């Protein structure tokens, strides 16, 4: 029996975003933690982005977010994580039938490109239609902005419960005004737009993830591992 496979999506957006001039992009642990979780459970993992390129969110490289074994894995060019990243694919190089889980990692960069990432959305929709799981963490649910259920033609999240980075969190980070200026939808905006029920954690930094059938979402970097675990459980069930 062929090993189960996960398609782990990254944002292609990597440009100045924060008020201090730092770039946003992929939030490291939101890709690293799911990757390591899936690999530990025996899954093969491929990385994909809409353009086949990616860059790191510079704030996610700070010691507060990247330390210990995570930092070791990230800096080791021979780590399983980095070797797999080096083979990142474009959607055109991917066959949705090969994968059982689509996992959208995050970083504020996703708010820029996921809603327009039609090829990534098509693959996610196909994996879901095939009976697979679609998961997203933190700002990853931006992928649901325009993502349809192939079987119904309706928005994938319509009538479902999701979570994701909170509007309160955006305010605490001081980026709410930046999002408004750039006309970027928050995860809560996306939920409202498509008729999903948004469930918030008690605190914006809590480890909090939820499952609604084969749809799995998590709220922040601390939830990346639990979101991956829930994805595996949803596939088993």
From Swiss-Prot:
Keywords, ordered alphabetically: Cytoplasm, Lyase, Oxidation, Stress response
Cellular location(s): Cytoplasm, P-body
The record's account of how the chain is modified after translation: Cys-138 is easily oxidized to sulfinic acid.
GO biological process, one term: methylglyoxal catabolic process to D-lactate via S-lactoyl-glutathione
Highest taxon of the lineage: Eukaryota
Main location: cytoplasm
Cellular component annotations (GO), alphabetically ordered: cytoplasm; cytoplasmic stress granule; P-body
Enzymatic reactions: methylglyoxal + H2O = (R)-lactate + H(+)
Consequences of knocking out this gene: Results in higher sensitivity to oxidative stress, reduced thermotolerance, accumulation of higher levels of reactive oxygen species, and reduced chronological life span.
Residues annotated as the enzyme's active site: 138-139, 170
Residues bearing the modification Cysteine sulfinic acid (-SO2H): 138
Major enzyme class: lyase
A molecular function (GO) term: protein folding chaperone
Family matches, as InterPro entries: Class_I_gatase-like (IPR029062), DJ-1/PfpI (IPR002818), Prot/Nucl_acid_deglycase (IPR050325)
EC numbers: 4.2.1.130
Pfam families: DJ-1_PfpI (PF01965)
Family of the protein in this entry: Belongs to the peptidase C56 family. HSP31-like subfamily.
Subunit and partners: Homodimer.
The name this protein goes by in its record: Glutathione-independent glyoxalase HSP31
Gene field: HSP31
């Amino acid at each position: 029996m062929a090993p189960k496979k996960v398609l782990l999506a990254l944002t292609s957006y990597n440009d100045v975003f924060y008020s201090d001039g730092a770039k946003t992009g992929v939030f490291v642990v939101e890709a690293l933690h799911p990757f390591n979780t899936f690999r530990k459970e025996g899954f093969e993992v491929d990385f994909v982005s809409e353009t086949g390129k990616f860059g790191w969110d510079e704030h996610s490289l700070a010691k507060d977010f990247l330390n210990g074994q995570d930092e070791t894995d990230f800096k080791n060019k021979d780590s399983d994580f980095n070797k797999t990243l080096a083979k990142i694919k474009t959607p055109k190089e991917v066959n949705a039938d090969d994968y059982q889980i689509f996992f959208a990692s995050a970083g504020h960069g996703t708010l820029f490109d996921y809603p327009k990432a039609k090829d990534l959305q098509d693959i996610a929709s196909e994996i879901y239609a095939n009976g697979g799981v679609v998961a997203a963490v933190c700002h990853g649910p931006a992928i649901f902005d325009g993502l349809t259920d192939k079987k119904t033609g309706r928005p994938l999240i319509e009538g479902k419960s999701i979570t994701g980075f909170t509007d309160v969190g955006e305010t605490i980070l001081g980026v709410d005004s930046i999002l408004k200026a750039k006309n970027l939808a928050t995860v809560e905006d996306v939920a409202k737009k498509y008729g999903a029920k948004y469930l918030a954690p008690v605190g914006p930094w809590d480890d909090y993830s939820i499952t609604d059938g084969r749809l799995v979402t998590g709220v922040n970097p601390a939830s990346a591992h639990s979101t991956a675990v829930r994805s595996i459980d949803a596939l088993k069930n």
